[in-house]
């Protein structure tokens, strides 16, 4: 995890106040901190205290509006950590806006890393392990169709692109259906920036969109986020080994729908996007419109 330039004094002061205000994190408040770059919605730090190193996140104050259930995230993260898929959790305190986990001294994957056959197999095996875990009580359901409707409702009326894509999405969701699939623990944001490699183990981080859901969309998230071609997709699916033939035939729909929900998220999160956000939202829209659903 690379460190960003010096964080603002106000940010660091807020972090320390939050840490002092929560009984499980009070002892960390005087630790040495370094801001970690990245993240569209949250702020994060590396924190050294009492000879130990931690990752600390201050969550976005309007997480619920973004479709994030912090209580459920805590349960998902603890289950994943117990299985060795995610860093061990020291404190998950939604009321304080804090998440504290062990700091993983590893390298964040690049887009190129996510295309290499050996790494595709490693990522697929991690995802398979996640989908094999029992689903703990209290995990919220991640329903992509519901999320799409909720996000679409936040867009301005009269948006021709949004109207066209909503019609295509309805057809794609109907084709996928539920297929009698059992719901499993899902990450739902398998971007290479959420994969940390310590040289031995591949760790999945950033679980705020995790939940109980359709495994097809979790597979689609990795394929869509990395724009995998047929050969790379075959490597990933063979290593994953849990996707029935009927679901393989629906992967194109699932990838399109994942991109659609991403586009809606960006449009609702950044009503007037600029810079990287504007470029990415436009790129997603162009990709969605090129596909005939």
Task: Please tell me what each predicted stretch does.
Residues 34-56, 89, 171-217:
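Active-site acidic catalytic loop and adjacent metal/ATP-binding pocket
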Residues 171, 201, 233-249, 284, ...:
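Short amphipathic alpha-helical segments and their helix-coil junctions
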Residues 70, 249, 253-257:
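Start-of-helix signal in alpha-solenoid helical-repeat scaffolds, especially tetratricopeptide repeats
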Residues 36-141:
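ATP-binding pocket architecture of kinase catalytic cores
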Residues 8-27, 31, 132-188, 198, ...:
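An alpha-helical support segment within catalytic cores of ATP-dependent transferases
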Residues 3, 7, 154, 160-163, ...:
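ATP/Mg2+ or Mg2+-diphosphate-binding catalytic cores
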Residues 216-245, 257-272, 286:
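Active-site activation/catalytic loop segments of kinase-like enzymes and analogous catalytic loops
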Residues 23, 84, 127, 131-135, ...:
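A general structural signal marking secondary-structure boundaries and capping sites
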């Amino acid at each position: 995890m690379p460190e960003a330039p010096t964080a603002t004094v106000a940010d660091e002061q807020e972090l320390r106040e939050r840490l002092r205000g929560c009984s499980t994190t009070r002892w960390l408040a005087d630790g040495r901190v370094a801001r970690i770059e990245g993240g569209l919605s949250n702020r994060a730090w590396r924190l050294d205290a009492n000879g130990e190193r931690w990752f600390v996140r201050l969550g976005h104050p309007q997480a619920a509006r973004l479709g994030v259930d912090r209580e459920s995230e805590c349960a998902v993260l603890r289950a994943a950590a117990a299985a060795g898929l995610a860093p061990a959790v020291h404190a998950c305190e939604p009321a304080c806006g804090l998440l504290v986990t062990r700091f993983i001294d590893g390298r964040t994957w690049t887009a190129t890393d996510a295309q290499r056959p050996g790494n595709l197999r490693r990522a697929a095996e991690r995802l398979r392990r996640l989908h094999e875990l029992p689903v703990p009580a209290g995990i919220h359901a991640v329903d992509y169709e519901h999320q799409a409707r909720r996000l679409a409702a936040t867009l301005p009326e009269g948006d021709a692109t949004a109207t066209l894509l909503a019609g295509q999405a309805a057809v794609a969701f109907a084709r996928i259906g539920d297929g009698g699939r059992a719901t499993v623990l899902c990450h739902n944001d398998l971007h290479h920036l959420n994969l940390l490699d310590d040289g031995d183990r591949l760790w999945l981080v950033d679980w705020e969109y995790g939940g109980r859901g359709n495994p097809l969309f979790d597979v689609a998230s990795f394929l869509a986020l990395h724009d995998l071609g047929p050969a790379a997709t075959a490597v990933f699916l063979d290593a994953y080994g849990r996707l029935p033939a009927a679901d393989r035939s629906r992967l194109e729909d699932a990838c399109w729908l994942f991109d659609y929900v991403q586009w809606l998220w960006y449009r609702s999160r950044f009503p007037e996007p600029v810079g990287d956000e504007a470029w990415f939202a436009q790129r997603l829209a162009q990709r969605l419109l090129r596909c005939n659903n």
